[in-house]
Design a protein with these regions (language model features):
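Polytopic transmembrane helical bundles with strong interfacial aromatic enrichment
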Residues: 2-246
Length: 246
């Protein structure tokens, strides 16, 4: 792939290397997908949720079909693309070189990263789906879990000794993993069932509960996006920023 993107990039920047071109393309795609994902996340939370409360039942099918469903399709696929390109860039150009310089394997860093952040999501999934708590309780639990996972990653990953690029994205990207799984594990499945049932004239009997669960997952993503964006910016602009005391 590096040779291909190098040729393409040479049309614009003749002196760019294959490695530099790959970095550029991955970050570019990651940013474009991320803007789409977070933009739609803010649309759903700040505009769509209050709007849908004012819509009468007869208007919902058309809104679901021509607005909500297409928006959710862009939302879920842009979420996947954001994480895919971001993890590719992080692993190939940050984790791998740092691991090589320190003489350690990068597998342990990825293993710890996935174990921690998928573990955080699994706990939140059970709480949202089985308990469906108040937003304040869920927010407190989320804050504790995220802080704990971030602290463990920063203090126990074998890489990240050169600067905080690996660590900052390891924390911010970890929140992105939680958000991605919320999208594909709760928000999309619940909304899909509600929308398809409504369009068929037979909405699910537990539609209100499913909507509440999707709302809690979406609102969790909304608040997680704030520190996520901070850590992503810090990784690029403040590579020496102290994170969790390191």
């Amino acid at each position: 792939m590096q040779h291909f993107v190098a040729v393409a990039a040479s049309l614009v920047v003749p002196t760019i290397t294959g490695k530099e071109a790959t970095q550029l393309i991955l970050r570019w795609f990651h940013i474009i997908a991320g803007i789409t994902w977070v933009g739609l996340l803010y649309f759903f939370n700040l505009i769509n949720v209050p709007f849908m409360k004012q819509v009468d039942a007869g208007s919902k099918p058309k809104i679901f079909q021509y607005l909500t469903l297409p928006a959710l399709n862009w939302f879920r696929w842009s979420a996947l693309a954001t994480v895919f390109f971001g993890m590719w860039y992080w692993g190939q150009f940050l984790v791998a070189p740092d691991a090589q310089r320190q003489g350690v394997g990068q597998g342990s860093t990825f293993g710890l990263f996935l174990l921690l952040w998928i573990g955080v999501w699994a706990v939140l999934f059970v709480i949202i789906k089985k308990v469906t708590p108040s937003g304040y309780v869920l927010g407190a639990i989320t804050a504790i879990l995220v802080y704990a996972a971030g602290w463990i990653f920063v203090n126990y990953t074998p890489v990240g000794g050169d600067d905080n690029h690996v660590l900052a994205i390891g924390v911010g990207g970890g929140m992105g993993i939680v958000m991605l799984f919320n999208v594909w594990g709760i928000i999309w499945p619940n909304n899909k069932k509600i929308i398809r049932g409504t369009l068929a004239g037979t909405p699910p009997a537990n539609a209100a509960i499913m909507a509440r669960q999707a709302f809690l997952a979406s609102r969790t993503n909304f608040f997680l996006s704030v520190p996520l964006l901070f850590y992503m910016a810090a990784s690029s602009h403040f590579s020496s920023t102290v994170i969790f005391g390191k």
